Amino acid sequence: MEESTMNSIAVFCGSSIGASDAYREGAIQLGKELAKRQITLIYGGASVGIMATVADTVLQEGGKVIGVIPTLLEQREIAHQQLTELIVVNTMHERKSKMMELADGFIALPGGPGTLEEFFEVFTWNQIGLIQKPCAIFNIEQYFDLLISFFDHMQQEQFLKAQYREALIVDGNAAALLDQCQSFVPPAIKTYELSK
């Protein structure tokens, strides 16, 4: 099968740096790998937290970074001013929509509810066929272990089909994670069965 075209990846991650230095180190690893592979980073456009670490690393390594930020956050003076391109949109919904349009794949790094909300939306869009792009979890320091167990529980309880659980890419190594994103083959689109 053909490997997916991977010119850009959207990263969803925290506007905080987290409790462990490992999160920052993982973000640096990912940034270096993206730049090395000439994959453009699409992200939330802020100059704070793990998201800034990924962006700064890609830029330092000679890569391209496109930030997408809503006016509300730009006005709070947290927009990153050194990016290849900064796109300012009106709402959070427009931000997600633009990131989904620009990206050939999606990676979640450690973050909070906003990170999960963004990731779950693209994961769901894959299930219903609105997009067919890799969705990956960069499991730095086993941060997402409980969430991954919950995905397994969803599958066991038949609220998540096996093909979608299997399509979810999870790895704690940046290079291995991107290898899997680049060789991603989309699962069949979800069909619905009526209850008996």
Region locations from a protein language model:
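Generic secondary-structure microfeatures
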Residues: 69, 103, 110-111, 126
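Arginine/glycine-rich "motif VI" loop of SF2 helicases in the C-terminal RecA-like domain
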Residues: 59, 126-133, 159-160
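A cross-family phosphate/adenosyl-ligand binding-site feature
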Residues: 2-102, 119, 140-175, 179, ...
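Short, proline-centered helix/strand-breaking motifs
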Residues: 110, 129-139
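A short, small-residue-rich loop immediately preceding and capping a beta-strand
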Residues: 41-43, 104-114
